[in-house]
From Swiss-Prot:
Residues 87-150 form the S5 DRBM domain. One of its GO terms (biological process) is translation. PANTHER family: RIBOSOMAL S SUBUNIT, SMALL RIBOSOMAL SUBUNIT PROTEIN US5W-RELATED. Pfam families: Ribosomal_S5, Ribosomal_S5_C. Residues 16-28 have a biased composition (Gly residues). Disulfide bonds: none annotated. Keywords: Ribonucleoprotein, Ribosomal protein. The gene is RPS2D. SUPFAM superfamilies: dsRNA-binding domain-like, Ribosomal protein S5 domain 2-like. Gene3D superfamilies: 3.30.160.20, 3.30.230.10. Residues 1-42 are annotated as: Disordered. This is Small ribosomal subunit protein uS5w. InterPro entries: Ribosomal_Su5_D2-typ_SF, Ribosomal_uS5, Ribosomal_uS5_C, Ribosomal_uS5_euk/arc, Ribosomal_uS5_N, Ribosomal_uS5_N_CS, Ribsml_uS5_D2-typ_fold_subgr. One of its GO terms (cellular component) is cytosol.
Amino acid sequence: MAERGVERGGDRGDFGRGFGGRGGGRGGPRGRGRRAGRAPEEEKWVPVTKLGRLVKEGKITKIEQIYLHSLPVKEYQIIDLLVGPSLKDEVMKIMPVQKQTRAGQRTRFKAFIVVGDSNGHVGLGVKCSKEVATAIRGAIILAKLSVVPIRRGYWGNKIGKPHTVPCKVTGKCGSVTVRMVPAPRGSGIVAARVPKKVLQFAGIDDVFTSSRGSTKTLGNFVKATFDCLQKTYGFLTPEFWKETRFSKSPYQEHTDFLLIPPGVKISEVVVDKSVE
């Protein structure tokens, strides 16, 4: 019996194979079949909207061209291409929410995500899902789709780059009201933790803020701050009083390209026309 025990697991003080004998030791390749050791493949983006096709083909190179003509963005890959790797995201809060059903309480997770490039573009996404990872992934996509331009200005003399909000602005959501006041250069962002992070992502360096209402409700606090930043482009100041020269919409400018069905190469269309 003693010899058999030695064969199986060595001496009594040693560790035998136990239940982990199949894996080939710690740190070895795990899993079996097709999925073991395969690198994740990147999905190739196939645009389904006119705007997506124009962006992928390089007809639109700046995100300001989209804002100028108020074109709706339906694909988050458009923002990824135009803004690029400078776009950062941060989870502001993940909170459980419940719904009463016949079977009992159904719990889901709500994620608040802020994205921005710290250069005048910021977005907010809110998503509810059964799993935390799914909620975060969905909120990031919604935040990218809601990216808006933020107008920046000066406190006094127009020296250097814009560093603060152009004027006093107020945003509201629920009972929460956020007010922003221009600040002199070097003042920094005088704000609570939640709006401070949003303002950093928007690229504002100096601002005074005040808030009132139930700021403990983080969701409304973030939305009020985002609403405040959106309103920076909601009015005309003297520098915008000049006569506007209207330009063609990208859809009008690139009509010939958009008439070609997606998936058909331009060279094939040219050959067909020459045959006719």
